[in-house]
């Protein structure tokens, strides 16, 4: 297998990926709290991990991908009380919304989507173990984790307990042994969902769910844990304390990966600034591929500034890729024969393929990888223009290999899947026949020097998303995908 290096937040350096189980890659990514429709900040980690998963599979790893839903949470409870409906009605509504927009963005479904509400027994069992081992204590129906008991606390975030206490905004509770102790179980309150437990009715704290569910499905040690950089502290720091305190396995996670923040026109995204964008609203103006490519155009660890201008640029960039795909599909149908130009194109394609894989193997650098993808697209389009400007044959073996390489790139990045289908579908034959009639009429107009009418046909077709291209071999049409 190709060697892969990843930046590990825990060690603050790049490391060669060495899986727990040879040939396998087990990953857990913190999912959404479904109390509203997903926003642009939610989309980035899931698109990022979708590409990581795709590439790991390409390299040859058997990937197990778990992503949770925090369907029991204060925000969900507040929303349900405000609307006068049950908490699970809210959670199910926005889980459905999550799948709708992520499916549109081409995010492949995780292998497992555990929910807090269906793993209460696992959570209670883990809390019991932590109490038995002296890492947690019960107070009037609440259960807290004692951070002083865990020697590695603060290693992920690079903070000492003294630093945390000095800079933390925490709810003052004089009952706790340490102000930084965090809740594993919360005693029931009026108007909130609750479950029976050894400490009385209540519900889980925020952090314990991910420890319980990741260990259940991936074991006490697994390869990747991901999420936004805002989760490093306290969520992921607390996860480590819980998971390692329970199992005794150190480390519980070999590689911690965190994506950077998204800003809106260089400002932090927030509802108070009225720059809080939902994915579903963005997709009303831009194609899913444009948004997906935009999210991947910058290295996942770097900040990403969202703006209409950047999305417009992404849209135009994808048009170049779409044109290259259309040109490859056209070249496949050309007369076969020996062609040195096609062989030279193939050699360039192999170079771009190697550069693409090197970039993806270096901490999943999609920004650099996509530059190789666009480099190959440019060469394909140059070759197409040269071939269609003269009568000639095409080396189909070379073109088939170029197509394989280019499709591999777009498949890993996860864009333009439909473009590869070409003009197919239930009515493809009838559509093609109709277009040939239109092209024939337009050609007659050109032969009779009715230029205005010929141009009118071309322009009207363009208005409905169909591009006409003229060449010495005749006109061809293609439907724009973006």
Enumerate the predicted regions with their spans.
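N-terminal, positively charged nucleic-acid-binding surface of large information/translation enzymes
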Residues: 11-14, 20-106, 473-477
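Short phosphate-binding/catalytic loops that engage adenosine nucleotides
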Residues: 61, 135, 466
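Structural preference for alpha-helix termini/caps and helix-kink/transition segments
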Residues: 268, 276-482
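Short, glycine/charge-rich beta-strand/loop segments that flank catalytic centers
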Residues: 69-74, 95-98, 108-123, 141-150
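The substrate-binding groove and active-site-proximal loops of carbohydrate-active enzymes
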Residues: 80-87, 111-117, 228-229
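Alpha-helical recognition segments enriched in aromatics with Gly/Pro capping
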Residues: 1-35, 46, 50, 64, ...
């Amino acid at each position: 297998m190709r060697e892969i290096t990843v930046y590990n937040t825990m060690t603050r350096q790049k490391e060669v990926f060495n899986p727990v189980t040879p040939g396998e890659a087990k990953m857990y990514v913190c999912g959404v709290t479904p109390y509203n429709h997903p926003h642009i900040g939610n989309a980035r980690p899931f698109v990022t991990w979708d590409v990581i998963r795709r590439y790991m599979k390409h390299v040859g790893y058997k990937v197990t991908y778990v992503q949770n839903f925090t369907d029991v949470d204060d925000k969900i409870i507040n929303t349900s009380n405000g609307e006068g409906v049950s908490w699970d009605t809210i959670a199910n509504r926005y889980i459905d919304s999550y799948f709708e927009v992520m499916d549109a963005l081409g995010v492949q479904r995780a292998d497992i989507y555990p929910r807090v509400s269906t793993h209460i027994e696992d959570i209670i069992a883990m809390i019991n173990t932590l109490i038995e081992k002296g890492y947690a204590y019960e107070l009037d129906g609440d259960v807290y984790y004692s951070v002083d008991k865990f020697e590695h606390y603060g290693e992920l975030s690079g903070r000492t307990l003294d630093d945390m206490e000095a800079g933390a905004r925490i709810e003052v509770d004089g009952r706790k042994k340490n102000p930084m102790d965090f809740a594993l179980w919360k005693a029931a309150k009026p108007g909130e969902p609750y479950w029976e437990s050894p400490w009385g009715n209540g519900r889980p704290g925020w952090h314990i769910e991910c420890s319980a569910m990741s260990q259940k499905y991936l074991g006490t040690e697994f390869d990747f844990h991901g999420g936004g950089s805002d989760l490093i502290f306290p969520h992921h720091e607390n996860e480590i304390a819980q998971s390692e305190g329970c199992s005794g396995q150190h480390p519980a996670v070999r590689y911690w990966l965190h994506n950077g923040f998204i800003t809106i026109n260089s400002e932090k995204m927030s509802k108070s600034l009225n720059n809080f964008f939902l994915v579903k609203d963005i997709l009303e103006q831009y194609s899913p591929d444009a948004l997906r490519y935009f999210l991947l155009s910058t290295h996942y660890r770097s900040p990403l500034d969202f703006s209409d201008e950047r999305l417009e640029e992404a849209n135009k960039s994808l048009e170049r890729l779409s044109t290259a795909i259309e040109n490859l599909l056209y070249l496949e149908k050309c007369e076969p024969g020996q062609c040195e130009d096609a062989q030279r194109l193939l050699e360039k394609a192999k170079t771009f393929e190697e550069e693409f894989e090197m970039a993806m193997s270096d901490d999943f650098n999609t920004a650099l990888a996509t530059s190789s993808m666009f480099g190959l697209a440019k060469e394909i389009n140059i070759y197409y223009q040269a071939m269609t400007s003269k009568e000639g044959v095409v080396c189909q073996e070379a073109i088939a290999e170029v197509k394989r390489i280019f499709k591999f790139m777009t498949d890993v990045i996860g864009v333009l899947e439909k473009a590869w289908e070409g003009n197919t579908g239930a009515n493809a034959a009838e559509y093609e026949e109709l277009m040939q009639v239109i092209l024939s009429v337009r050609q007659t107009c050109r032969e009779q020097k009715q230029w205005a009418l010929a141009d009118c046909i071309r322009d009207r077709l363009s208005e409905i998303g169909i591009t006409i291209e003229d060449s010495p071999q005749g006109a061809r049409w293609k439907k724009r995908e973006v």
